[in-house]
Amino acid sequence: MCAGFYVAVHPWLETQSLHKVGHTGNLAARLHDGSYTTCFTDEWRYCFTLETPTKKDAQKIEAGVLYCAQFFRVKNKELLCLLPEKIKQLAEDVANCLNISYTLCDAPTYEMNDSTIVVEPSSPSDPLISKEKLRHLVITPVEDEDRFADDVLFFSTGETRTTIEDRLYQREAANMGYQELQRSGRAILQMACRCGKTRVAYLILSNYLQGKVLYLVPGLSLLRQTLEKLYLYGISLKNVMLVGSDQTRIVLNHDTIEMTTNPVIIVKRIQEASSLLVIATYQSSTLLVDDFDLIISDECHRICGEWETRPFTHVLLNFKKGHRLFLTATPRYDTPLSMKNRELFGGVAFRYYLREGIEAGYVNDFELQMVAAPKLAHQLSNREETTKQIIVKQIIMALAYLKTNVRSPKMLVFTRDIKQAKELYAELVDLGVYALIAHSTLPRQVILKTFTEFCSSKEPVILLNCRLFQEGVEVPELNAVFFAAPRHSPRDIIQSICRPLNKQVQKPHATIFLPLEVNTENVCLDKFSSIIPFADALASEDPRFYEHLLNPSEVAYPINWIGAHGSVAELLQLARHAIRYGTQGKIDRLTRSERLPWKAAFAELKRTVEICCRYPKINDGFHFGGATLRFDTWYKWVIKSYLQYKNNEPSSLEPYQVLDLESLQDWTTRGVGGPYPWEESMAFLETWLAQNKGELVAIDIHQGGWIGLDATPMERLSGVLTTVSQRDGRSYGKNRKLRPKKGFMIPPQQAKDLDRIFGKHNLKWRKDRDNGFLKEDEHGNYTGEPTCIQEAYQTFKEYVKTNPEYIEKYWPGYAKGKHKHQELPHIWESGLAPPRYKAFKDGNKRLIQRSPKKKDVKN
């Protein structure tokens, strides 16, 4: 007799996607027991069994499975509303967690004879098991919806199989990813959906094929498609092993290959091979051993979640060898185990925005349509019923809009949960709308049939689902998505938006529908709160949308309103205001430095360095999206974040951004240190005084030194001493405004440097004071003895007239006026310098273009 845990199915139960779980001391006799044959026909069969050494071990597995699948259990029955594959994976995880040895048998048959029939003694239904050990294996409804999509309907969202020629950005991504792997051992490639991450992964893993490579994917369908693409790119199946639970043979041209979950075969081949490519699902990763030179984690945001060992985190948390490459379109940062963890994930080595893919022609464009609530629907008494009816009417309005632009539109509707999907489906069908529904509690065959019907329909059709089709599913003819419930996760939002964006010849732009409860002219900003997370997520992927929010009059964006009862223009303005300033309407959320689109801001920084031959000044402005921004604020944030990154501290910058900065001329010296580096200037001052018998000679402290990258040491010293002279007499510290004209507004260490250097030559550099305050007349003019810095400036003014050779040597180009404007003359004349940022007393902020015709004067 053979004891074991089993999952059995009967045709009557299978129609409802129900499966019987249990344990027995005699697998050969169990399905012939009276409890099975009395109420059912004799059509029982095993889906699979886990043969165990003892019946008690099998009982523990059953108890563990029922505990972990409690949300999918029929009350007081050993029936689970889960796919057999899910129960199998769960049972194996439970057995491994409880250290129970087992033999997995798929669809087994056992010989039955008279001696097999044994009456089994009853046993406690709930044996002692450590639920704390199994807590991380508990399946929640949301998690199961995700995993179901992984294994059943995970379709490719990358390039088509005929696209083999590398795109420019793919080569760039591969180069930057490989460089970061060599530098730190970890790299993230964040690339928009449908932009060919698999091709980039192939270009990188080609450098590791002499060793062992592991390619992890979140589902069996994606495993097969990844294999097909890599085979198309030139990978030989000779050195490929597939680790997954699908026993179907895969045929590629004349080559064939099969998956395996046999741990003996897997471990032996990995350990004995000198070169090997293993493609495995995350769910099967516990069968692998830590012996890889490169590990690629596709759709790596799925790894994130609770900080605990589970199939998706097994390799990340337990494997120590090899480089790690992570691929995703939507990083996840809102979980305990998140991609902010640089030690585990590294940083983003390459970033490719959704808008870039659209403009390059690889991704279909889209429009936003906000759908207003029906005018009188809010007057009903039942709030829950009202919301349901509002959404139904908004869905019908959206479908009607699509019919005017598309011949046979197809629209995905994402609901809050399965309950809402069922309710909306019933309402729509009653109203005669052609609607379909799919969710994880339906049998697999029903879901596939529904999906096929949706894809092949020649009539306008709606498909309601919760999360089943949110990620990875490709419907070539899909025209629109409708959010029937607010989404707060940027990952969920972007993945859902990308569903209809696959590029096809003559396919019209897609439509994203956002329903809002705005039904009167007295609109409250709180009504727009549901779209703020959506707008934040989209703005991070689409710089054009970000620019539009800053100034819609200058940057157009395809956004409109359906069913508005008031002025559409006013409603859109209110929506933009709520997105930018929040529902309280107070703080500008968009102009924070970290939210400024990197590529646009860095392009302006690079232009300033390369064309103007300098780094930004305090009063430089930036014109972006029609908004007036102070560029120096962003620039200071960049420097701070860069220093944090280099000091291995938490930083807002990613590796690709650091590489951008370090590609600029003199970034680590002039970019970070500024045009007037203190230590460098003090060293020059000390040498100068020693060589010139303690005489400062001539220094310009009126305009300060030239700030260009080609500035001479004397020009940089002029800038430093200009600052010293201006700050003498001002307080240092947070309360300096309360102590005017007293103290010194410079760090104490720098004051010590000046005392030491000037003190060697008995030079006075501080201004005179009376009881701690500067000596001044009633008009504020300094009346004390001049300092050596002031005396050097008087000499400088004389030299400008009498000693042009000296001026040209230490201040080259001074006579041409570059000192006055701190710009190269030809840059000034052509108007290529950054505009000046100025905030006026009336609250307005303007950019004043620097040019000879418009002098830089107060307005």
UniProtKB/Swiss-Prot annotation:
It is an enzyme of class 3 (hydrolase). This is Probable helicase A859L. Keywords: ATP-binding, Helicase, Hydrolase, Nucleotide-binding. Its EC number is 3.6.4.-. The keyword Nucleotide-binding applies. One of its GO terms (molecular function) is helicase activity. ATP binds at residues 191-198. Residues 178-349 form the Helicase ATP-binding domain. A motif (DEAH box) lies at residues 298-301. It holds the Pfam family Helicase_C. Belongs to the asfivirus helicase A859L family. It comes from African swine fever virus (isolate Pig/Kenya/KEN-50/1950) (ASFV). Residues 394-553 form the Helicase C-terminal domain. InterPro entries: Helicase/UvrB_N, Helicase_ATP-bd, Helicase_C-like, Helicase_Restrict-Modif_Enz, P-loop_NTPase, Phage_T5_Orf172_DNA-bd. It comes from the Viruses.
